[in-house]
């Protein structure tokens, strides 16, 4: 449900009839998820990429167990050429250290934009690689030259997935997204400097709808493991791996991931997500402090329903427990390298249960804790992260009125969180934040 849809009087009326409000909530969430999963966005809806996709090969490879797709956006401004050098490093030193075999095919769309690098030749633009063992990412080794390509366009992602599926069909598909990232926040993830574009979360969901989803998504970006980002994938992926905090340039260890997958090509999407998350610990540098793997199935739906109940009860009891909420929010863990508005979901429930006297809210929190333990398949963090458990949620502070220039004021003035995210369509958390910010 979109936050802001109710006015304050509606919230007050809901206090009297809150039990009626619960009726059918689980059904509503399940129906919305099912409808979203059934929709397919027409290609005309998606903005076209700068360059058309190349012709598909007439003779596709035999069907593999897995096709691993890596969407590598290195088209950054000249001040971030270090990211571009890691693009070449990850292909040559990690992905090509294992390469493809009959069970696991690996394809990469790598965009260096207009900023040439001496590594592997000074090619620019975007190239598609079918990665074989020992390969280097030179122009001569590219399967296709896509030229100037907008990696921030959902159509580019659709074209890449379609190309990979047609040329390298498989029983399962994994998609790794490689770039900077800032969670659900718009105009920050998959930045394409040449096109001045970003792949925002609503566009990502559109693209995944258009290709009928994948089996597993790996976020080789910062701040991805939030319940809001997970909601964008629900219905179009079975599991995801990433970090609820910032990550270093090393990110995933693709060598470890591909070695494990080739050794056990029958592994499930959930198992692959765990392997991917574990690889962050194996190859982490001093900037990668946390990683987790999350299941996006029915248990995730139940967790989202529990968070919706919690958001509703927090909203209708706000006047009674505002101070207790503030204490709980302040005490809840916030990964040190992420936005200060993000809080660890599990720790939020722990602190609310400890500081808020409402029996209903305590029950809601207990339900959230129980379900998150089932949803998080594996998680790891260094001690400096504090008591984090694998999933963040957005909960900004609430100055009254919002202070000029505060991040909360920015959110209140910019309705993306309320209007464009699947999470706020499915739950009442956005309604709570709207009331909380007043």
Sequence positions of predicted segments:
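Signal peptide processing junction and immediate N-terminal pro/mature segment
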Residues: 43-55
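Terminal, contiguous helix-loop blocks that mediate binding/assembly
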Residues: 55-64, 166, 181-184, 188-438
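Cleavable N-terminal signal peptides
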Residues: 39, 49-50, 220
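Residue-level detector of buried hydrophobic side-chain packing
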Residues: 94-95, 175, 220, 393
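Short acidic, glycine-rich surface-loop motifs adjacent to enzyme active sites
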Residues: 171-185
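N-terminal secretory signal peptides that target proteins for export/translocation
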Residues: 1-26
